[in-house]
Design a protein with these regions (language model features):
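Amphipathic alpha-helical substructures
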Residues: 404-405
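C-terminal scaffold of the Radical SAM
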Residues: 46, 53, 76-100, 106-401, ...
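Basic amphipathic alpha-helical segments that dock to polyanions
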Residues: 392, 409-417
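Flexible, acidic/Gly-rich N-terminal and inter-domain linker regions that tether
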Residues: 1-54
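Local cysteine-cluster metal-coordination motifs and their immediate loop/turn environment
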Residues: 58-74
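Short, amphipathic alpha-helical interaction segments positioned at domain boundaries
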Residues: 434-461
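A short, conserved structural fragment
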Residues: 415-425
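Short, cationic-aromatic polyanion-contact patches
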Residues: 182, 306, 428-444
Length: 461
């Protein structure tokens, strides 16, 4: 498939609105507390008939310091002793979850996110993985995708070696920006040398994929400064890159209130940074996967996209499409059978549920057939930039143009604007429309039509 991308400033300005990132459909905004532990247990029981492989997401929320841009659920503390009471509850939740699933189901994907997963000690990392392997069957290294988010300030060569022995074969390194002025403005001082040491250790230990995360739109960023960061990152030659748009939502995320809004780059500068990023990364041979993600052409993500097997979930793009996802730990979200379920958001509530022997689900949603159909359509578009009407009709027993009649006028306008090619066979997102894939997906989002605009979502660019 053609994986090229074109930066069209006029189109971007015309379509630059707020919208979901579609790590799920329906999005978490639609979750309800009417969905609780009983509904989750029922979904797990139904899922056993499929024999699908499992994916485990562990949320380790602790951070030594707060990055002011952060929108994650985290606990900022210098007190490392807080980790053990949390891990004790995670072990108990693993036992509760394990009892819900057939023993023959294999874990093909595992991810530690945060927070800062490496906040915990090496002994605690060992114990967590030992417990996981005791309770669940993990696929061999050649098959399994076992990843961890790394703060290079919180890891060294010994930590990296341990993680590889524990079975991790992928890591993402948080960088955001190497400019010291920007780092000071967001309270994340991190040298290039710290990042390079961890990256080189990961390569030496045989990690199969190393990703670097950047953010554009942070205070005091400039085109020239971010280009210097890009040049340095390209020298590191990671397998993947994520370049996220900073969403300044201080009314929702308290740490962001410590950012001086007057120091944020104006919209035009953000767009210039984005254009520079696209030009530099694609010029260096990286493929635009979609939704802020780039990969080397021989990386598994790029190959899966070429082969039509790429998938997207709460962990981002994935090559493991057919897994039931178990969310472990505070605020984690899982996807089991035709449901999404989210754990308690506060440590106190999470601990109380676990101590009482309850699965700590406090909200979620059971998808209707329409939800599942629309999720399939959105996933096909967001992963492959192509939608074959006949394939959707065969899979769901519908007549596409009749079922989605309300979407056709909006699609027609997008065709006129050069975002997509629309004909009787389907939709093909053109190079000018790839940066705006969220806009194309929003056409098929039944929930947005019931709202006064996509409230609470970040800008698409």
């Amino acid at each position: 498939m053609d994986q090229s991308i074109t930066f069209d400033l006029d189109l971007i300005k015309r379509y630059d609105q707020s919208g979901p990132r579609y790590t799920s459909y329906p999005t978490a905004v639609e979750f309800t507390d009417a969905f609780g532990e009983a509904a989750y247990r029922a979904a797990c029981a139904r899922s056993n008939a499929s024999g699908r492989p499992l994916s485990l997401y562990f949320h380790l929320p602790f951070c030594d310091t707060v990055c002011f841009y952060c929108a994650c659920n985290k606990v900022a503390t210098k007190d490392r002793s807080l980790a053990q009471p949390y891990l004790d509850r995670v072990y108990r939740e693993l036992e509760l979850q394990r009892a819900l699933f057939d023993g023959e189901r294999v874990v093909e994907q595992l991810h530690w996110g945060g927070g800062t997963p490496t906040f915990v000690s090496r002994d605690q990392m060992q114990a967590l993985m030992d417990t996981t392997r005791r309770l669940f069957r993990l696929a061999d290294d050649e098959v399994g995708e076992y990843s961890i988010e790394i703060d290079p300030r919180e890891a060294d060569a010994q930590t990296v070696a341990l993680l590889r022995r524990l079975g991790f074969n992928r890591m993402s390194l948080g960088v955001q920006d190497f400019d010291p002025k920007v780092q000071k403005a967001v309270n994340r001082i991190q040298t290039e040398e710290e990042t390079l040491r961890v990256l080189e250790a990961a390569r030496a230990e045989g990690f199969r994929s190393i990703s670097i995360d950047l953010i554009y739109g942070l205070p005091l960023q400039s085109v020239a400064g971010f280009e210097r960061t890009l040049e340095r990152v390209l020298d590191f030659a990671p397998d993947r890159l994520s370049v996220f748009n900073y969403a300044h939502l201080p009314q929702r995320f308290m740490p962001q209130r410590r950012i001086n809004a007057e120091e944020l780059p104006p919209p035009q500068v953000k767009l210039d940074i984005l254009q520079t990023t696209i030009d530099r990364l694609t010029g260096a041979g990286y493929v635009y996967i979609g939704m802020d993600h780039f990969a080397r052409p021989d990386d598994e993500l790029a190959l899966a996209q070429q082969q039509g097997t790429l998938y997207r979930n709460f962990q981002g793009y994935s090559t493991h499409a057919n897994c039931d996802l178990l969310g472990i730990g505070v605020t984690s979200i899982g996807k089991v059978d035709n449901t999404y379920a989210q754990n308690r958001r506060s440590l106190e509530e999470y601990y109380a549920d676990i101590d009482a022997g309850r699965i700590p689900v406090f909200r979620g949603i059971e998808l209707t057939r329409d939800d599942e159909l629309r999720r399939d359509v959105i996933t096909r578009l967001i992963c492959h930039f192509v939608l074959d009407f006949a394939a959707v009709e065969d899979a769901w027993g519908i007549e596409f143009r009749r079922y989605f009649a309300d979407a056709l006028p909006k699609l027609g306008q997008m065709q006129a604007d050069g975002l997509i090619e629309l004909d009787a066979q389907g939709i093909r997102v053109l190079p000018c429309g790839r940066l705006l894939i969220r806009n194309v997906c929003m056409v098929f989002d039944a929930y947005l039509a019931t709202k006064q605009g996509p409230v609470g979502f970040s800008k698409v660019i």
